[in-house]
Amino acid sequence: MIFTNNIAAFQNVVLVKKVKIVLLIFYGSIMFSMTQVNKEECDYYQNLNLGEIYYIYNPRYPLPYSGSKCTWTITSYHRINLKCSLVEFSENKNCNAGSLTVKKNFANKYCGNITLNIESTSNKMTVILTPPGRFFCEVRPIKRVKDSTNCNCGWKNPSRIVGGTNTGINEFPMMAGIKRTYEPGMICGATIISKRYVLTAAHCIIDENTTKLAIVVGEHDWSSKTETNATVLHSINKVIIHPKYDIIEKDDWQINDIALLKTEKDIKFGDKVGPACLPFQHFLDSFAGSDVTVLGWGHTSFNGMLSHILQKTTLNMLTQVECYKYYGNIMVNAMCAYAKGKDACQMDSGGPVLWQNPRTKRLVNIGIISWGAECGKYPNGNTKVGSYIDWIVSQTPDAEYCVIE
């Protein structure tokens, strides 16, 4: 579709069936291109940088449109603002006679004669036109006060361990543990994502008395008090479990297995303690074929001994097709990884699946260890963090994140 800011010229606008469509959008000196995802359908995709503006409107605008359904998918490193000066559809109770649907972390359908001003909670927004009707909107990225591109996350310290599965002392500053205050050891892993929040698996805490849980950061060997001076025990201020968390009891598989824990006080960052990056730029990626690192204080073998020293192992991310062979449609918002004889195991749940960005060398928390079968015999299942970026950001309005990995 060709876009212009000359309203008088809109009557000459036509829908062009090409894979690559050049958009001439003059707003000052702004000029950029848009990709039509499917040349047979009215589907479009655009990634926006700060300062760029993108206009979307129905084919044949300003005339009403009664053709096929159209979809615009907009992504950015930042939140997205949609401002519609015209939304004109037949007004009815369920908006079934033409509508404009806006998907953020949830979908809202609009009809009637209205205007809209909507902000996303993450870096993706989808607009769906169901004809008949007409609309005209302006889309632009907006920087959250707490979003930062000049920040640090995902750093890693050198390891003195050669050829072993033990991590180096504070090698992974983003690693945290969840423990019961009345007993030694960890019941689950977690990942530091900001100064007040850690990310973990919902099943780790759903049946726990959270008043008797604590978050441990800067730990290496929970049986020793002398190997590092970075260890701090944090009380929990708030527990946020995904509202659609569920378990398939027959197989012990988890759905929407994600939770946030807010600490009572700020986690002090330094060389030995700090946040992982979140996949703001790679939230759609499957990471298939990539090597990832998983961490935990869990069992060293199925029903074996617990490790008091933080362990690491490298797994390979599988394709969704390979995952479906083992777990079926449960893998929509999950991912699986495998390496022969290697795996996360019991008590590793909630810990991170870390992918190293090859360009920046930063560690990105792309997954949460969720479930597995016999520790290394089959691929493990992990919650896909990228699928929940919207939810994470919406639940942590006071958090600051690095949006550039």
UniProtKB/Swiss-Prot annotation:
Q: Tell me which SUPFAM superfamilies the record gives.
A: Spermadhesin, CUB domain, Trypsin-like serine proteases
- Leader sequence range is 1-35
Name the organs or tissues of expression. Expressed by the venom duct.
Positions of the catalytic residues: H203, D257, S349
Q: Using the UniProt record, name the top-level EC class of this enzyme in a single word.
A: hydrolase
The record's subcellular locations are: Secreted
- Record's GO cellular component, any one? extracellular region
Q: What is its main location?
A: secreted
Domain (CUB): give its ranges.
42-147
Q: List the disulfide bonds.
A: C42-C70, C95-C111, C188-C204, C323-C336, C345-C375
Residues in Peptidase S1 domain copies: 161-397
- Name any one GO molecular function: serine-type endopeptidase activity
Give the EC number(s) under which this enzyme is classified: 3.4.21.-
Q: Which SMART domains match?
A: Tryp_SPc
Alphabetically list the UniProt keywords. Allergen, Disulfide bond, Glycoprotein, Hydrolase, Protease, Secreted, Serine protease, Signal
Q: Which InterPro entries match?
A: CUB_dom (IPR000859), Peptidase_S1_PA (IPR009003), Peptidase_S1_PA_chymotrypsin (IPR043504), Peptidase_S1A (IPR001314), Ser/Thr_Proteases_Immune/Dev (IPR051487), Sperma_CUB_dom_sf (IPR035914), Trypsin_dom (IPR001254), TRYPSIN_HIS (IPR018114)
Q: Which residues are glycosylated?
A: N113, N209, N229
GO BP: proteolysis
PANTHER family in the record: TRYPTASE-RELATED
Q: Which family does it belong to?
A: Belongs to the peptidase S1 family.
**What's the protein called, per UniProt?**
Venom serine protease 34
Q: What is the lineage of its organism?
A: Eukaryota, Metazoa, Ecdysozoa, Arthropoda, Hexapoda
